[in-house]
Amino acid sequence: MGSNYIVIEGLEGAGKTTARDVVVETLEQLGIRNMIFTREPGGTQLAEKLRSLVLDIRSVGDEVITDKAEVLMFYAARVQLVETVIKPALAQGIWVIGDRHDLSTQAYQGGGRGIDQTMLATLRDAVLGDFRPDLTLYLDVTPEVGLKRARARGDLDRIEQESFDFFNRTRARYLELAAQDSRIRTIDATQPLDAVMRDIRATVTKWVQEQAA
């Protein structure tokens, strides 16, 4: 079996925290217990400070964060996490379960913000090389459903306050990218919770068994 990096992706309110719990439970049932958890942006001292800058609407006062500055902060946080936490863990045979990775940037900034996708791909390759998650679970939910759930939780960060149009563009890009990459498995997160959990368990179990074959 190769490296074991599983990432959970999706719009706000898609249910990533619940999905992570199901992934962990499924892996443990398969005898896998040596794992760590990451989130993006974040996961290291530096990356957490960058997270605060890019997501907290109060962090820069009245200054507007430009789209390109936003992208670069996401990548600065990401490469710090990958190089100092994720890669060392994978090298030791530890499983890594991530809350978001590069697919978020390709969808949110490439789709939602409309940043040139060729530029994003070039930046990704320069920063990450060929490093990719081994399995990505994309929890697909409409912005109407996802944002209703997110807003019920309380305070929204800077990106969560974007328009429905922004999230519709983001979702469209997620779906486009998922259709192009066999390592990305789409889960219908608009289903009842039991059905979503069932699909996650089945997807993870099948993938682990395929890797072990």
Curated annotation (Swiss-Prot):
Top-level taxonomic group: Bacteria
InterPro entries: P-loop_NTPase, Thymidylate_kin-like_dom, Thymidylate_kin_CS, Thymidylate_kinase
Gene3D superfamilies per record: P-loop containing nucleotide triphosphate hydrolases
Keywords: ATP-binding, Kinase, Nucleotide biosynthesis, Nucleotide-binding, Transferase
Positions that bind ATP: G10, L11, E12, G13, A14, G15, K16, T17
Function, in words: Phosphorylation of dTMP to form dTDP in both de novo and salvage pathways of dTTP synthesis.
Record PANTHER family: THYMIDYLATE KINASE, UMP-CMP KINASE 2, MITOCHONDRIAL
Any one biological process term the GO annotation gives: dTTP biosynthetic process
Signal peptide: none
GO-annotated molecular function: ATP binding; dTMP kinase activity
SUPFAM superfamilies: P-loop containing nucleoside triphosphate hydrolases
Gene Ontology CC: cytosol
The name this protein goes by in its record: Thymidylate kinase
Reactions catalysed according to its record: dTMP + ATP = dTDP + ADP
Stored NCBIfam families: DTMP_kinase
Its EC number(s): 2.7.4.9
Family stated for the protein in its record: Belongs to the thymidylate kinase family.
Source organism: Salmonella paratyphi B (strain ATCC BAA-1250 / SPB7)
